Amino acid sequence: MALTLLALLSVLAVQETHPAPASPPQGTGVVIREADTVVRQPPPHRGEGMSTAYRISDGVPNRAMEFRKRALHPGASIGLHPIAHDEVYYVVSGQGVVTSDGVETAVKAGDAAYLYDGNVVGVRQTGEADLVLIIAYPLAQRKD
C-alpha cells in the first residue's frame, strides 16, 4: 500500500512539473459573443487611421487558427507586412484595396482575397463606409 501511494505521488509530481499538452475541449466547442471581443485600436502593422477589432478567436483555448473581424474606418489601412502562412481577407461590407507583393486589387462586399505564404500584404479602406473584413489564418502548428 505504501509503495502504491509513493508511486501515485511520483506520477502526480511529474504531471505537475511537466503537464500534458492541452487537448481541444469536448462537446460543442467554444461559443464567442462578438460583443465580448470588441477593441477600438489603430490598425496593425503600422497602418493608418482607426479601426474596430473583433478579436474573436483570442479567448479560444488551444486554438489552431486565428479568426478575426476588423472594421477599417474611413481612411484607415492595415500596413504592408510579410505573412508566414496563407491568409484570407473576406469583405463583409464596404470597399477597399488589397495589396499583395505590390499588386493592388479593388475589393468590395462579397469578395475574398486569398493571400499566400511569403507575400507582403496590406489593405486600405476606400469609399465612404467602413471596410469590414473577416480575417482567417492558421497559427503555428501545435505539438501535441
Residue ranges and their predicted role:
Residues 2-13:
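Bacterial N-terminal signal peptides
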Residues 103-118:
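Short acidic-glycine-tyrosine-enriched beta hairpin
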Residues 66-83:
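Conserved short histidine dyad/triad with adjacent acidic residue
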Residues 61, 117-142:
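Ligand-binding loop in jelly-roll beta-barrel domains
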Residues 12-64, 143-144:
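A short, N-terminal "cap"/entry segment at the start of jelly-roll beta-barrel domains
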Residues 84-96, 101:
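Glycine- and acidic-residue-biased ligand/ion/polar-headgroup-sensing regions
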